[in-house]
């Protein structure tokens, strides 16, 4: 399988959201993408999310949590990530419409991203479905090397571009060294050249 890349252009991220919003499952697909690029959770962890992971009952009312907490399936490490106000709103807009009955019953033991293709019972979206959703939208946006892992890489890349220290990004991504993180988030020669050319000593 080819190596996927982060989405480095902010306008392309906006275009991805526009493309993902189309169709019967548009709101679900946009939320999957939005949580992915804002938390760095791997696709297996995203798809395993249940309503109880993002919602809580407070004073007999359901509300969105301020952070996500889970044990990563791959590393078995605990991971706690804050949810931005915008992401909290996006989650609430989705669940209050898509899962209105469960919200009314305060029944939070259901998958956030449930598949519609199951024969009885409830299952989350599969990793293959997740891959198709993201990679297909990427092709429509003119992004050829895109997959579900691109969301995690996009998170790291834009933190780096926004001036967040490499050591902190390494910690957020659970990497063993800064060098691995640099390669992972797609810092290439052009980025290094730009950094040096701006020095002007």
Label each residue range with its predicted role.
Residues 10-39, 43:
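Basic, Lys/Arg- and aromatic-enriched nucleic-acid-binding interface segment
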């Amino acid at each position: 399988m080819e190596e996927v890349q982060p989405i480095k252009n902010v306008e392309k991220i906006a275009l991805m959201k526009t493309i993902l919003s189309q169709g019967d499952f548009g709101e679900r697909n946009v939320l999957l993408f939005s949580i992915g690029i804002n938390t760095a959770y791997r696709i297996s962890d995203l798809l395993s999310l249940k309503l109880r992971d993002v919602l809580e009952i407070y004073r007999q009312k359901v509300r969105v949590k301020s952070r996500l907490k889970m044990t990563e399936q791959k590393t078995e490490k605990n991971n706690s990530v804050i949810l931005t106000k915008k992401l909290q709103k996006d989650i609430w807009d989705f669940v209050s419409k898509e899962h209105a009955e469960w919200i009314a019953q305060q029944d939070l033991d259901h998958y956030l991203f449930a598949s519609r293709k199951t024969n009885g019972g409830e299952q989350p979206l599969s990793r293959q479905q997740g891959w198709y959703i993201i990679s297909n939208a990427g092709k429509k946006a003119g992004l050829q090397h895109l997959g579900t892992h691109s969301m995690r890489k996009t998170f790291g890349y834009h933190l780096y571009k926004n001036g967040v220290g490499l050591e902190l990004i390494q910690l957020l991504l659970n990497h063993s060294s800064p060098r691995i993180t640099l390669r992972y988030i797609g810092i290439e020669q052009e980025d290094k050249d730009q950094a040096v050319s701006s020095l002007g000593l």
